[in-house]
Amino acid sequence: MRVYALLCLSAACLFTGVAWAQEANSGFELRTTVSAVSPESQQLTDAPRDGSPVTGGVRAILYPTWKLNSRWTISGAYQVISRPYFAEDFGTQGHGVKGELLQLNLSYVRFWEHNRSVVVRVGQMSSAFGAFLQRYDSMQNPLIGIPAAYGYYYNPVTFLGLVGAQVDATAGKFDARAQFVNSSPANRRSIFDNDQYGNWAGGAGYTIRQGLRVGGSAYYGPYLDRKYPYFFPGEADPKSLPASGVGLDVEWGWGHWNAWGEWQRFQMDYHVIPNFTQHTGYAEVRRTLNPRWYAAARIGYQRYSVGPGAQSYEFVAGFRPNPYQLIKFGYTVQQGAEYSGTQGNIAAIEFVTSFRAISLAKD
């Protein structure tokens, strides 16, 4: 399970070049993933955007990794993204470009006999909840869109980094992780923001056989801040109102097939209004057709305690001109009370390239 421990570290740092790190005792690497997307959807013509049905977006993620020695590593991930890029941006106004520090942490790794390992990280990192955050990079995500629970704007699991500490451990076929951070994944707070409260998250998994792993995760802690849209007058102190999430996940790979799935339940507590709950889930499959082409699909749903739910169906054909580039052709069908006819459907093309900009190694 030594390989799995390294995967835990790389996933938390959004795939920051573990293979390179294994080749040398110390050194520095800067890896980059750049993507561009062009979606077409009638959602883009609705208020408040009121724009053309066709638009474009770009995204770049820089992954610096400084390996100090065989046990200590400093890793980071910095993202520059234009708006709109993902479907959740379609309901926002105007255009813009924003930079975000997603990851910056110091890690320590140890291995022992009998497939045991521990990775300790301190700094800014992604939430330990869920499974999709390991595939946030467009080169790792076979689809163009993202599952409904994940995102930037009031989603129960943020893509943005949280500040704290995490321990990942493996023992044989078991793996586990525990995390304590400065804010909830349901409402990420910067270390410079008010209303920061400690939050716990963790998860565990078991590899039934090679290629098949099942797991679960959870988080708990205060999430509201006094400027939150749903923090109404007369509400209780934010630190007494927790958000909680529980989830199950599965990953399977066999031959030319890969599949992923998650089921999640979230609850946000209030005093002046009823508690809000959300159920969501998705199933995703990818079939490699030949060395250059693959087909992928994702089916997802959302159900809420207040308001109607929705479901989505995304289909993608992917083409790899070479090992460093990927072109995706996708179509998404979104159904729900907020969509009329084909209004929520999205046709999109995404181009992705990944390369190693700097690599300095020292034995």
Which positions does each model-derived feature cover?
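Outer-membrane beta-barrel "beta-signal"
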Residues: 319, 342-363
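Sec/Tat signal peptide C-region and signal peptidase I cleavage site
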Residues: 15-21
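Gram-negative outer-membrane beta-barrel proteins
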Residues: 36-44, 82-88, 112, 128-132, ...
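Detector for outer-membrane/organellar transmembrane beta-barrel domains
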Residues: 24-27, 171-176, 195, 205-305
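Transmembrane beta-barrel strands of outer-membrane/channel proteins
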Residues: 30-38, 76-80, 120-124, 178-182, ...
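Outer membrane beta-barrel
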Residues: 23-32, 51-185, 196-198, 205-212, ...
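Hydrophobic, lipid-facing positions within transmembrane beta-strands of outer-membrane proteins
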Residues: 56-62, 99-106, 161-165, 198-202, ...
